[in-house]
Amino acid sequence: MTHIRKSHPLLKIINKSFIDLPTPSNISTWWNFGSLLGACLITQILTGLFLAMHYTPDTMTAFSSMSHICRDVNYGWIIRQLHSNGASIFFLCLYTHIGRNIYYGSYLYSETWNTGIMLLLITMATAFMGYVLPWGQMSFWGATVITNLFSAIPYIGTNLVEWIWGGFSVDKATLNRFFALHFILPFTMIALAGVHLTFLHETGSNNPLGLTSDSDKIPFHPYYTIKDFLGLLILILLLLLLALLSPDMLGDPDNYMPADPLNTPLHIKPEWYFLFAYAILRSVPNKLGGVLALLLSILILGLMPLLHTSKHRSMMLRPLSQVLFWTLTMDLLTLTWIGSQPVEYPYIIIGQMASILYFSIILAFLPIAGVIENYLIK
């Protein structure tokens, strides 16, 4: 008799995706981050749901409602810290996941890669809107500065900004719509993650060697479910350590002051996970140019399948490309540091050089390295 998990209409979908899924036998710990991202998304939705039960999206009461959650609601403080620090862990896993896909050439599964880029953009938009909700100083001014970037669009810019704001400045209407969007977007992310997984299971997983592994596959359960569970335990440990021992380490002290439109903070900056893009934005002296550079810093990932020139899929056996990959990693860390610094010498010039290097590595150096490596292995 066929097992129920193989015959039941719903269970057989789960079975084909998470139990009997044929998986390469040599995938490493770097392949854990997809499941960790799923765990992060579920955690964020659950903690966010409990926060939404007590939060009021109104400019007069938003800040005090956050204070009320932390002081008066049972375990409200830990729910808030898990949610805000969970976002940091989410982006840490997200950037590692993207880095692994670049290193091992998984971007050649273009449908999976493109849905992944869409997920990245939606995640960034959701996180930005979530940062506005506590209605502290950095929330208000961050929202003002970032939404103002749309005014750089020719002809429709000013109208577009006022349409986003729902008025002539960031106010109650803005906060209300940001809360509504911040609440609904994670559910669209679940749907898109389903599409992402469907595309992945059409081709099967890549592996560290970048070779076809059809002849050597093992079932996902129990081998990789145990492996993923260990990763999940480490993730939970990291999140609890961050939320319980140093909950404000990654936040901004200015956000403990209620939003004041008449008092601008000395240095307006977003959360750490947006600092690299913020540094690229600031490195271009022209407003429209900066906005385009900001957009391209993410959308450039979509060009990676087209820029792949090597005969080898993975970078595992390509030393020249490996050097460039780790240079790119350090360049992004440099941009993250620059984004947190004031706009003055020497940070301006370092930011400009790091931005040029970022685009040069992806658009020119990696494709050239691929051609050189092809020549060397002839």
Curated annotation (Swiss-Prot):
The gene is MT-CYB. InterPro entries: Cyt_b/b6_C, Cyt_b/b6_C_sf, Cyt_b/b6_N, Cytb/b6-like_sf, Cytochrome_b, Cytochrome_b_C_euk/bac, Cytochrome_b_N_euk/bac, Di-haem_cyt_TM. Keywords: Electron transport, Heme, Iron, Membrane, Metal-binding, Mitochondrion, Mitochondrion inner membrane, Respiratory chain, Transmembrane, Transmembrane helix, Transport, Ubiquinone. GO terms for biological process: mitochondrial electron transport, ubiquinol to cytochrome c. Heme 1 (or BL or b562) is low-potential and absorbs at about 562 nm, and heme 2 (or BH or b566) is high-potential and absorbs at about 566 nm. It is found in: Mitochondrion inner membrane. A ubiquinone binds at H201. This is Cytochrome b. Component of the ubiquinol-cytochrome c reductase complex (complex III or cytochrome b-c1 complex) that is part of the mitochondrial respiratory chain. The b-c1 complex mediates electron transfer from ubiquinol to cytochrome c. Contributes to the generation of a proton gradient across the mitochondrial membrane that is then used for ATP synthesis. It holds the Pfam family Cytochrome_B. Binds 2 heme b groups non-covalently.
